Each structure stands twice: as structure tokens, then as C-alpha cells.
């Protein structure tokens, strides 16, 4: 991070992003590509899980907002 002030003007001029110190290393996939597409049921379950994970805590906070304001 000490070299960042010297490198930043150089990066802006060339429009290059410095992502890591060791170039050439890339992420390898941990498992092979899926052979069949996801079914409608699998997608529906995934969407329900994602939305409930975000909406349940926010619904709790909004329903008890008056208690949070008092504290």
C-alpha cells in the first residue's frame, strides 16, 4: 500500500486496474459446470430463501421500531 500514491497516476493514465501483486493467478472452478439447467422448483426455492433471509429481519425491525426508538 505504500506504493499506491506513486502508482495511482500511472494507472489512471493507462486505464489499467492493478488487482493483485502476483499477475497470472486466476480462480479455478472447484466443481465441473452444471450439466442440466435448474428446474423451476429449484429456482423458486432459491428465491424464497434469499428474500426471506433479507425481509424477515427487516420486517422484525420495522414492526418493533417504536421499541428501538425508546432505547
Swiss-Prot record:
Membrane-spanning intervals of the chain: 40-63
Mitochondrial matrix side: 29-39
InterPro entries to which the protein is assigned, alphabetical: Cyt_c_oxidase_su8, Cyt_c_oxidase_su8_sf
Gene3D superfamilies noted in UniProt: Cytochrome c oxidase, subunit 8
Protein name: Cytochrome c oxidase subunit 8C, mitochondrial
Keyword Membrane found: yes
Transit peptide segment: 1-28
Sorted UniProt keywords: Membrane, Mitochondrion, Mitochondrion inner membrane, Transit peptide, Transmembrane, Transmembrane helix
Domain of life, source organism: Eukaryota
Gene: COX8C
Amino acid at each position: 500500500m505504500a506504493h499506491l500514491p506513486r502508482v495511482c497516476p500511472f494507472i489512471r493514465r493507462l486505464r489499467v486496474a492493478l488487482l493483485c501483486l502476483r499477475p497470472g493467478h486466476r480462480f479455478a472452478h472447484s466443481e465441473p459446470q452444471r450439466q442440466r439447467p435448474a428446474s423451476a422448483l429449484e429456482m423458486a426455492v432459491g428465491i424464497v430463501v434469499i428474500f426471506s433471509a433479507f425481509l424477515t429481519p427487516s420486517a422484525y425491525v420495522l414492526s418493533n421500531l417504536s421499541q428501538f426508538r425508546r432505547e
